[in-house]
């Protein structure tokens, strides 16, 4: 027994040492980002570091928060401290037995316990106060406090963070707003529980999610016998004949992070009934220990009874004495007395089995899990803005209903979330702007064109430089700040117009001077080469006739005869043949002198002077010298030619709408196709792309007979017949060792026996001292119980099994006045008398039998599992722990237990199986699974439909139009289409784009499928397919392109609206991202490209737009032109012609 006590002391020391390792802990409160006017409470909890049992009486929960805190945290609460200890008359060498220890009861006061008075949480929302309290889980030497914070939901608005204190430990309370509008964050989705569920309601209209439940006992003195809650438990367990159940009260429970209080028992609330049933089955709670004690051991000393309160004459409470890691709450209330008696039992697990009549208690706090039906909040798309900032860009993302998923391959997203009114705001930085910014937000792919950001920054800079004339500077900046050749041509055009009369003569002068220099250098180089060649030839001729040209004394090779003669006279006499200065007549001395002599080229220079000097020829050089670059005729002619050329370049370099969908098209031809043979299109199309094909089919025998042909193919929709497998759960694996010296293993109830998923192996009646502590009574007694179980279960995702798959597209054709539409799938066709459209096949990564896992909203995408267990699941497999409407499905633990023994030491259990849940193993190898994204999902009880936004799938399409079309019947089209423009928003240019609203009328027929385009006078910038019905139709066209002078009109075929509207300039300081899937379309109508005529028309429209726009800009440009002409006249005056005198 002494060794046993020594072990307890060492355990207490170890627990105390943990206290100093961490002095600040975090208690997180999750709030919805929209706080309504209804009632509601938020709750948070945190486990603190162990504290010694002796210091518990001095604990006081302090707060620096600006809450209206209930006074219970400072109120003294009388409790009975019930402990166990070795009997005083037990000898040191005595063996452990049921008679060697005893219980002890004392009275003391504790402050801040979770003893909540009545009406504190029941009152109206405006009168509710914040409750801060703590619970205790203790062994004989130390306690683990658990701090609870229950606050009205409006504190989410008034509080960001504050501090709580318990003893020497500090708790940082952090209010964190989730992206949920009003629901709770479960499985990455925003879940709103349904308080009342109609059984007749279709099952696919709600979902069932398991969320944690925290309950607090509230004693209440009343004459209502229905509040004898122990009687309720006994009734559920069909226990009768018990009379000691007089305590009256109820539990107030909270679901998840925020909820209304639920009062248990309440028979008309199905949630309260379920919680009451779970309490009866798991009286200690469904969460069995702290997160840090998943692998632990404890030793049972034995059963004992005691007095509560200590003044009782007989025992009123019983339990099991233990040592080791604490498991459950050590605070209870006595069930037998009507007046509440609170018990604190460190090192004792009180009796809470409701099938026992006497000496039982109720836990002061209870934690469990509750499956609840409810709905998932709908999500909205994100709006993303970006601005240039330094070398990168600052971006903001907004969403009305919260941002549940945001990522970017080009930006740094720190996940720090803020809320702006009813919207969620996330700010992030993009370091590079040389590539377009790509952001995935709420299941949508957004792209921000960085060149539009550069345009905005250019306009801002230009306007800032010329801030004295902001209106004029801004209008000019809008025209100049265009990227690419188009922008440079605009700058060149305006510079030529304003300053051409100065720039042309200046540039001409510089060019002429450079050409003169080159002409002179080329001529000079030619003269030097000829001179060197002449000297070489003279030397060669002298060598042929006279012999060597090398001096015999200094060995210097001479180039001419006079130089050799001077060497022969001077070198033998010790004189330099060039400067005639005396030196030694040796080769080394003469050669050293030649290196410093400055007259070694004297003979070459004399020969050069004797030749005639070079005179430049009178051809190119003279022409350049006398060129009249200052002539008004020359400058004016060049000025006009440059303006015309620059206008053509400006128009030709304008951006056109580019198609970037990765599709392959084998169709060729113009807008009008003579139908000499069958018209066939055979192409592959990405799943997210739409395809529009329009042509006029011409009769080759009669060119006047034409049939309009329109073909539209919608984006692919994936239809999956599914089986809802339920919710995948994650849990904590626990390995426990329970040991006692005497008695069979069935003598005690172990904690894992009330867990939903557990496995136990008992090693009963040890046969030797090798597995018995020294203070045990002997061999052949006692038990080592090994158990593994799962707790802290939480839902992590929804799981669906694919039964069958179907890939469909909506196809429509309009041939003359005949219209036909059909939804086709793989190996299906739309067939008419003249047209056949087939989807031949689909390349897909989905297969029947796959399992789809969604770890958040459907829009966040999912993971494809090729193998998913549904029948015999092992712990660690995908699908190991499942929550289904039929209940919890537990996995099998395939490992084996091993009892680790040492002589005279308490044994411990080891487990050689897997200890990681399937969810944790999946996270560790997530990159090995295929993932997919979803857009526009629609789910029912047995089907799931969605669109693939990534274009990861492709369809093979084949279209054939028979050449035997009846031109006589179809060429006469009675349908009359009229177009008019209604409104426009957005900006011209190739960045942000614009939205043109058209009013289209249809007469003479009931319906007509055609395309409406957005065009200016020169070309078109966007189109859409419209299925018109008789009367007025509103059509929206998204386009990109144009210029400041573009008046965008609504056009059908060659007819356009009589008026057009101008779009705004692309100078917004914030650029909005666009959805890639909205722009993922192919439009092919065979219209010709913009040619020379189109270029001049576009240039004229642009000039007219400038003239009709800000007239001050035109005035400034004209003033600059006049000023440049005036300066030209001053600098280049007219040449005076002198007449000859007669």
UniProtKB/Swiss-Prot annotation:
Claim: Signal is one of the keywords in the record: yes
Disulfide cross-links: 31-156, 65-162, 114-133, 138-143, 180-190, 215-253, 382-441, 386-395, 411-430, 458-481, 741-776, 745-783, 757-890, 771-901, 786-909, 812-821, 829-838, 869-873, 975-1005, 998-1050, 1015-1020, 1051-1056, 1090-1094
Keywords: Disulfide bond, Fusion of virus membrane with host endosomal membrane, Fusion of virus membrane with host membrane, Glycoprotein, Host endoplasmic reticulum, Host Golgi apparatus, Host membrane, Host mitochondrion, Host-virus interaction, Inhibition of host innate immune response by virus, Inhibition of host RLR pathway by virus, Inhibition of host TRAFs by virus, Membrane, Metal-binding, Phosphoprotein, Repeat, Signal, Transmembrane, Transmembrane helix, Viral attachment to host cell, Viral immunoevasion, Viral penetration into host cytoplasm, Virion, Virus entry into host cell, Zinc, Zinc-finger
Pfam assignment, any one: Hanta_Gn-B
Topological region Cytoplasmic: 511-633, 1132-1142
Domain of life, per lineage: Viruses
Topological domains, Lumenal: 22-489, 655-1110
Segments of this protein annotated with the region Fusion loop: 763-783
Residues carrying covalently attached carbohydrate according to the record: 139, 353, 405, 933
Zinc finger CCHC-type: from-to: 551-571, 576-597
Key word Oxidoreductase present: no
Region (Binding to the ribonucleoprotein): 522-539, 594-611, 598-609, 617-631, 1127-1142
Gene3D superfamilies reported in the protein's UniProt record: 1.10.8.1320
Transmembrane segments: 490-510, 634-654, 1111-1131
Annotated ITAM domain residues: 617-640
GO biological process: fusion of virus membrane with host endosome membrane; signal transduction; symbiont entry into host cell; symbiont-mediated suppression of host innate immune response; symbiont-mediated suppression of host TRAF-mediated signal transduction; virion attachment to host cell
GO CC field: host cell endoplasmic reticulum membrane; host cell Golgi membrane; host cell mitochondrion; host cell surface; membrane; virion membrane
Chain coiled-coil ranges: none
InterPro entries found in the cross-reference section: Envelope_glycoprot_Hantavirus, Gc_C_bunya, Gn-B_hanta, Hanta_Gc_N, Hanta_Gn-H, ITAM_motif_hantavir-typ
Other facts noted in the record for this chain: This virus is non-pathogenic.
Family: Belongs to the hantavirus envelope glycoprotein family.
Listed name of the protein: Envelopment polyprotein
UniProt source species: Prospect Hill virus (PHV)
């Amino acid at each position: 027994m002494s060794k046993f006590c020594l072990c307890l002391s060492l355990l207490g020391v170890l627990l105390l040492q943990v206290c100093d390792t961490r002095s600040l802990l975090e208690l997180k409160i999750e709030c919805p980002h929209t706080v309504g006017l209804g009632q509601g409470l938020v709750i948070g909890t945190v486990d603190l570091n162990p504290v010694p049992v002796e210091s518990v009486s001095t604990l006081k929960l302090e707060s620096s928060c600006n809450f209206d805190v209930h006074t219970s945290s400072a109120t003294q609460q009388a409790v009975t401290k019930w402990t166990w200890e070795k009997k005083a008359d037990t000898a040191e060498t005595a063996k452990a037995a049921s008679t060697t220890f005893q219980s002890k009861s004392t009275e003391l006061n504790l402050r801040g316990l979770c003893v909540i008075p009545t009406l504190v949480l029941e009152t109206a929302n405006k009168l509710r106060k914040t409750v801060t309290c703590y619970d205790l889980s203790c062994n004989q030497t130390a306690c683990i406090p658990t701090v609870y914070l229950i606050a009205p939901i409006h504190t989410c608005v008034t509080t960001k963070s504050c501090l709580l204190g318990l003893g020497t430990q500090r708790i940082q309370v952090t209010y964190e707003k989730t992206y949920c509008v009003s629901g709770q964050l479960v499985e990455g989705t925003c879940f709103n529980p349904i308080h009342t569920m109609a059984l007749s309601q279709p099952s696919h209209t709600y979902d069932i999610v398991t969320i944690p439940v925290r309950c607090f006992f509230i004693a209440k003195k009343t004459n209502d016998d229905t509040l004898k809650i122990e009687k309720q438990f006994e009734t559920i367990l069909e226990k009768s004949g018990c009379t000691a159940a007089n305590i009256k009260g109820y539990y107030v429970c909270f679901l998840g992070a925020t909820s209304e209080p639920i009062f248990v028992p309440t028979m008309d609330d199905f949630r309260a009934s379920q919680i009451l049933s779970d309490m009866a089955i798991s009286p200690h709670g469904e969460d069995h220990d702290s997160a840090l004690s998943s692998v632990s051991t404890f030793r049972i000393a034995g059963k004992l009874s005691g007095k509560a309160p200590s003044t009782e004459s007989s025992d009123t409470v019983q339990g099991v004495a233990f040592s080791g890691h604490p498991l459950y709450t050590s605070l209870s209330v006595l069930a037998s007395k009507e007046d509440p008696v609170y018990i604190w039992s460190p090192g004792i697990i009180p009796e809470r089995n409701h099938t026992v009549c006497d000496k039982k208690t109720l836990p002061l706090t209870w934690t469990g899990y509750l499956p609840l039906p409810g709905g998932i909040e709908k999500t909205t798309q994100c709006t993303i803005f970006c601005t240039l900032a330094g070398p990168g860009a600052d971006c903001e993302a907004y969403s009305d209903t919260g941002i549940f998923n945001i990522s970017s391959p080009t930006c740094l997203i720190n996940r720090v979330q803020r809320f702006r009114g009813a919207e969620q705001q996330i700010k992030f930085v993009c370091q590079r702007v040389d590539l377009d910014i790509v952001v995935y937000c709420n299941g949508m792919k957004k792209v921000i064109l960085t060149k539009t950001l550069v345009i905005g920054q250019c306009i801002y800079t230009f306007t800032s430089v010329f801030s004295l004339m902001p209106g004029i500077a801004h209008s000019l900046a809008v025209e100049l700040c265009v990227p690419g050749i188009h922008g440079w041509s605009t700058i060149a055009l305006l510079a030529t117009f304003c300053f051409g009369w100065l720039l042309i003569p200046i540039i001409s002068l510089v060019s002429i001077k450079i050409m003169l220099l080159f002409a002179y250098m080329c001529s000079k180089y030619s003269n030097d080469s000829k001179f060197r060649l002449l000297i070489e030839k003279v030397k060669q001729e002298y060598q042929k006739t006279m012999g060597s040209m090398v001096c015999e004394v200094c060995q210097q090779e001479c180039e001419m005869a006079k130089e050799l003669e001077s060497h022969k006279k001077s070198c033998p006499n010790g004189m330099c043949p060039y400067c005639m200065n005396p030196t030694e007549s040796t080769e080394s001395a003469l050669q050293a002198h030649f290196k410093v002599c400055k007259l070694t080229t004297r003979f070459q220079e004399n020969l050069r002077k004797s030749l005639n000097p070079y005179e430049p020829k009178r051809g190119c050089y003279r022409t350049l010298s006398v060129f009249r670059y200052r002539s008004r005729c020359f400058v004016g002619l060049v000025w006009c030619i440059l303006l015309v050329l620059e206008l053509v370049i400006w128009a030709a370099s304008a951006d056109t709408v580019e198609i970037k969908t990765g599709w392959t098209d084998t169709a060729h031809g113009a807008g009008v196709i003579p139908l000499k043979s069958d018209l066939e299109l055979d192409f592959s199309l990405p799943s997210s792309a739409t395809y529009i094909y329009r042509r006029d089919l011409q009769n080759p025998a009669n060119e006047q007979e034409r049939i309009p042909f329109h073909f539209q193919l919608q984006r692919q929709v994936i239809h999956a017949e599914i089986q809802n497998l339920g919710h995948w759960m994650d849990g904590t694996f626990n390995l426990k060792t329970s040991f006692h010296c005497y008695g069979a293993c069935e003598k005690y109830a172990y904690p894992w026996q009330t867990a939903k998923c557990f496995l136990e192996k008992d090693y009963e009646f040890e046969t030797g001292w090798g597995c018995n502590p020294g203070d045990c009574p002997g061999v052949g007694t006692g038990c080592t119980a090994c158990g593994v179980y799962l707790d802290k279960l939480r839902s992590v995702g929804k799981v669906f099994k694919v039964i069958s798959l179907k890939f469909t597209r909506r196809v429509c054709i309009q041939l003359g006045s005949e219209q036909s539409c059909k939804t086709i799938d793989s190996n299906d066709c739309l067939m008419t008398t003249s047209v056949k459209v087939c989807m031949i096949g689909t390349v897909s990564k989905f297969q029947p039998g796959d399992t789809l896992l969604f770890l958040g909203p459907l829009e966040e995408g999912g993971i494809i599992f090729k193998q998913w267990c549904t029948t015999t699941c092992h712990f660690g497999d995908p699908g190991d722990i499942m929550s289904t409407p039929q209940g919890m499905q537990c996995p099998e633990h395939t490992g084996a237990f091993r009892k680790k023994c040492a002589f005279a030491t308490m044994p411990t259990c080891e487990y050689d199986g897997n200890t990681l849940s399937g969810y944790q193993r999946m996270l560790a190898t997530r990159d090995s699974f295929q993932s997919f994204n979803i857009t526009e999902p629609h789910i029912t009880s047995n089907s799931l439909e969605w669109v693939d936004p990534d274009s990861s799938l492709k369809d093979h399409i084949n279209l054939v139009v028979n050449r035997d079309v009846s031109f006589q019947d179809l060429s006469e089209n009675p349908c009359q289409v009229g177009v008019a423009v209604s409104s426009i928003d957005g900006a011209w240019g190739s960045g942000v784009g614009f939205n043109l609203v058209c009013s289209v009328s249809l007469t003479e027929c009931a319906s007509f499928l055609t395309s409406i385009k957005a065009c200016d006078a020169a070309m078109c910038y966007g189109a859409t397919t419209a299925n018109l019905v008789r009367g007025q139709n509103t059509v929206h066209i998204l386009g990109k392109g144009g210029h400041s002078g573009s008046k965008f009109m609504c056009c059908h075929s060659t007819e356009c609206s009589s008026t057009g509207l101008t779009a705004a300039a692309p100078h917004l300081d914030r650029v909005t991202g666009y959805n890639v899937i909205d722009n993922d379309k192919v439009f092919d109508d065979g219209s010709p490209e913009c040619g020379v005529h189109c270029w001049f028309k576009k240039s004229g429209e642009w000039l007219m737009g400038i003239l009709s726009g800000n007239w001050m800009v035109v005035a400034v440009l004209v003033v600059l032109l006049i000023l440049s002409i005036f300066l030209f006249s001053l600098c280049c005056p007219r040449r005076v012609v002198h007449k000859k005198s007669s």
